[in-house]
Amino acid sequence: MNGKTIILANPRGFCAGVDRAISIVERALEEFGAPVYVRHEVVHNKFVVDNLREKGAVFIEDLAEVPPGATLVYSAHGVSKAVQQEAAERGFRVFDATCPLVTKVHKEVARLDAQDCEIIMIGHKGHAEVEGTMGQLAPGKMLLVETVGDVAKLEVRNPDKLAYVSQTTLSVDETKDIIAALNARFPNIRNPHKEDICYATTNRQTAVKELAEQCDIVIVVGSPNSSNSNRLREVAASRGIDAYMVDNASYLQRTWFEGKSKVGVTAGASAPEVLVREVLATIRGWGHETVREGGGAEESIVFVLPKELRREGETKPDLCKR
């Protein structure tokens, strides 16, 4: 043995929301046959999307591309009220694969709006989840904040009737800084009853921080358009080590590992384990022979499928436990 080691982060890869979203598309294809139309990539991973496309899924952005009476699935990121209304008017058979933790944020937005609160959204402009959440209200009713610097530029109607929500896949540390800035500028701003950043995002970022303390380099398996995968790479890099994100093993470069004795490997919440295994095989082939699993939070959450797609014996759990 040469002492060169690969340490696998735990937890890593698929979260409950991603697992549910993929299963909804697969079950819809089994029940109703191809094509099944999916509004936006169901999750942000090229391997997953290509695999579903081969099975008969058709990924679209505009509902005008969907024929009357077709089966339509909303992506895990959620959709706006306008998209929901158009789908209803056109009579599609709709299955909502929105992550339940994103749906929780949508419900919070509706509750706050009913109380006449102006709402600030912490998130990345253009991300599908942000568009879906901000689209729960009429255009212009929510304010978007991406950085601490944006907080100083905010113009609000009434600082005493103000609240915020956030995208579920953000950097935990950066979001804390933005929240601190919001609370400093608007002391009466309402905070969510429960943090909006999801358990999977938090757990994976915590695990990669621990990984970065033990390793000389961290590899994150994830697609370029995956928000949570990008945040994992950034978190690792912020610890002062080399960190790279790869869609699959073919993107690895042997020179990255020269002089590195300990390699950390993790995967974004939308990246399947098969891609992790391919990355491991490649790195092992370059001389890092030992592989061990890191410790970390155990995840046992399972999100139920829509009742129309459940099989016999699949029941709705009373509670989703971590």
From Swiss-Prot:
Pathway: Isoprenoid biosynthesis; dimethylallyl diphosphate biosynthesis; dimethylallyl diphosphate from (2E)-4-hydroxy-3-methylbutenyl diphosphate: step 1/1; Isoprenoid biosynthesis; isopentenyl diphosphate biosynthesis via DXP pathway; isopentenyl diphosphate from 1-deoxy-D-xylulose 5-phosphate: step 6/6. Binds 1 [4Fe-4S] cluster per subunit. InterPro entries: LytB/IspH. GO terms for biological process: dimethylallyl diphosphate biosynthetic process; isopentenyl diphosphate biosynthetic process, methylerythritol 4-phosphate pathway; terpenoid biosynthetic process. The keyword Mitochondrion does not apply. NCBIfam families: ispH_lytB, PRK01045.1-2, PRK01045.1-3, PRK01045.1-4. Catalyzes the conversion of 1-hydroxy-2-methyl-2-(E)-butenyl 4-diphosphate (HMBPP) into a mixture of isopentenyl diphosphate (IPP) and dimethylallyl diphosphate (DMAPP). Acts in the terminal step of the DOXP/MEP pathway for isoprenoid precursor biosynthesis. Its EC number is 1.17.7.4. Its cofactor is [4Fe-4S] cluster. Isopentenyl diphosphate binds at H44, H77, H127, S226, S227, N228, S270. This is 4-hydroxy-3-methylbut-2-enyl diphosphate reductase. PANTHER family: 4-HYDROXY-3-METHYLBUT-2-ENYL DIPHOSPHATE REDUCTASE. Belongs to the IspH family. The active site is at E129 (proton donor). HAMAP family: IspH. Dimethylallyl diphosphate binds at H44, H77, H127, S226, S227, N228, S270. Gene3D superfamilies: 3.40.50.11270, 4-hydroxy-3-methylbut-2-enyl diphosphate reductase, catalytic domain (3.40.1010.20). (2E)-4-hydroxy-3-methylbut-2-enyl diphosphate binds at H44, H77, H127, T168, S226, S227, N228, S270. It comes from the Bacteria. Keywords: 4Fe-4S, Iron, Iron-sulfur, Isoprene biosynthesis, Metal-binding, Oxidoreductase. It holds the Pfam family LYTB. One of its GO terms (molecular function) is 4-hydroxy-3-methylbut-2-enyl diphosphate reductase activity. It comes from Neisseria gonorrhoeae (strain ATCC 700825 / FA 1090). [4Fe-4S] cluster binds at C15, C99, C198. It catalyses: isopentenyl diphosphate + 2 oxidized [2Fe-2S]-[ferredoxin] + H2O = (2E)-4-hydroxy-3-methylbut-2-enyl diphosphate + 2 reduced [2Fe-2S]-[ferredoxin] + 2 H(+); dimethylallyl diphosphate + 2 oxidized [2Fe-2S]-[ferredoxin] + H2O = (2E)-4-hydroxy-3-methylbut-2-enyl diphosphate + 2 reduced [2Fe-2S]-[ferredoxin] + 2 H(+).
